[in-house]
């Protein structure tokens, strides 16, 4: 099955967020540079920009949402795991139109693709705990 345009947007956002965190470059410039190298036809560009701008703008709040569900400090997390969790928590907190199961699954898939050998297990554990304790699993979305 081909990855969806939105999944590709998440994967691209992850790579730009990773680069931003390491280099401290301007996020918009990093995104423009990154997209020059990609086939943009297969990416949900609007969602890509929403993720990188939304996450960098609200990064401290997103990090504070994550902290209670981590068994180590944010600084101790790998850059990839931290970026994946930021994407997932952004979706859980800001995008009520995306089912929580989709956000969890997408985080796991990103971890399998970009993370270390057991990253997907760690991401799954953190997101499962957060969804349960924050009550996202009880949220009803009316479209």
Swiss-Prot record:
One of its GO terms (biological process) is DNA-templated transcription termination. GO terms for molecular function: RNA binding. The keyword Transcription regulation applies. SUPFAM superfamilies: NusB-like. Gene3D superfamilies: NusB-like. It comes from the Bacteria. Keywords: RNA-binding, Transcription, Transcription antitermination, Transcription regulation. GO terms for cellular component: cytosol. HAMAP family: NusB. Involved in transcription antitermination. Required for transcription of ribosomal RNA (rRNA) genes. Binds specifically to the boxA antiterminator sequence of the ribosomal RNA (rrn) operons. Belongs to the NusB family. This is Transcription antitermination protein NusB. It comes from Buchnera aphidicola subsp. Acyrthosiphon pisum (strain APS). The lineage of its organism: Bacteria, Pseudomonadati, Pseudomonadota, Gammaproteobacteria, Enterobacterales.
